[in-house]
């Protein structure tokens, strides 16, 4: 699914331009300064209009991953969006955090990694170190490490 979105959005080189993807799919975007620290990102559908918002106080890498994660929910789980057509990751709550992620959350994380560090873009640069790849793709070193691990066979054959 992530590859399809990249092709449809005509994104061909790192760092993946998330604004280009949003624009290609008619999704508005805003960075919000007054989100609670516990809210990373959200997507809202208001009739035919769709808006994505991220917590502006987060690090650039976190904002990018959170937005890509929300896009994963939007593109993969849209029919079952809870909360009156709003999806919020890490919503404010007095409840303790769940010990494990739901399958939908895991899928959205995988989608985000595939969208931000696609194999086709990683392959030509894999000889670079993890810190350099992190800077190139504008993602955390953890996201790069996971991408390399997931694509180990394809990268080193």
Please place each PLM-identified region on the residue numbering.
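Active-site hotspot residues in diverse enzymes, especially metal/ion-binding acidic/histidine motifs
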Residues: 1-157
């Amino acid at each position: 699914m992530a590859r399809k979105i990249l092709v449809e959005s005509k994104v061909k080189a790192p760092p993946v331009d998330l604004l280009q993807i949003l624009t290609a799919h008619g999704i508005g975007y805003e960075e919000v300064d007054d989100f609670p620290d516990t809210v990373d990102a959200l997507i809202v559908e208001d009739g035919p209009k769709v808006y994505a918002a991220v917590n502006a106080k987060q690090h650039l890498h976190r904002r990018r991953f959170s937005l890509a994660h929300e896009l994963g929910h939007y593109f993969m789980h849209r029919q079952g969006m809870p909360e009156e057509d709003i999806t919020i990751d890490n919503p404010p709550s007095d409840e303790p955090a769940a010990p494990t992620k739901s399958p939908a959350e895991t899928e959205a994380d995988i989608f985000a990694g595939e969208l931000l560090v696609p194999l086709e873009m990683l392959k030509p640069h894999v000889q670079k170190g993890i810190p350099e790849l992190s800077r190139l793709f504008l993602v955390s070193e953890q996201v790069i490490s996971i991408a390399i691990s997931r694509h180990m066979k394809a990268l080193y054959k």
